[in-house]
Amino acid sequence: AGLFLLLYPTVSDYWNSLHQTRAITRYAENVAQLDRTEYEEIWAAAQRYNRTLPKRENAFALTEEQKREYESLLNASGNGVMGIVEIPKIGCALPIYHGTDDAVLQIAVGHLEWSSLPVGGGGTHCVLSAHRAFQSSVQRNAVSKSALAAAHSP
């Protein structure tokens, strides 16, 4: 039991890094395979979605139908990854997943489902969430508030 406790942080960090690398690689490969028309359709669908947000009756919760639509957008790899956050200062790249449940936040960055999708545009406000409560976040602890991060979507 003692050995397990000593090895857990290292094994956990390795496992999370492996998962993040695989998710980012799969995402990048799938986006690279999109032809220009597919890419533009994905982007336009996300922009249309963002324009509907201010018109919703409940701005902070999605209906089941809205949730299905949300999860289908910016999902080029089919595994829920909608983009990548890069923090060049520490050489860190993390996948951005749909939603912010505990399972997502343990391994990656989550997108708050009722906020704008990360495609930019006037009046949009994309909210990304991550926390530092697990071992593989050691790198992120070194990031100052002034560090620049970039989010990439298809």
Predicted regions and their residues:
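Solvent-exposed, non-transmembrane regions of membrane-associated and secreted proteins
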Residues: 1-154
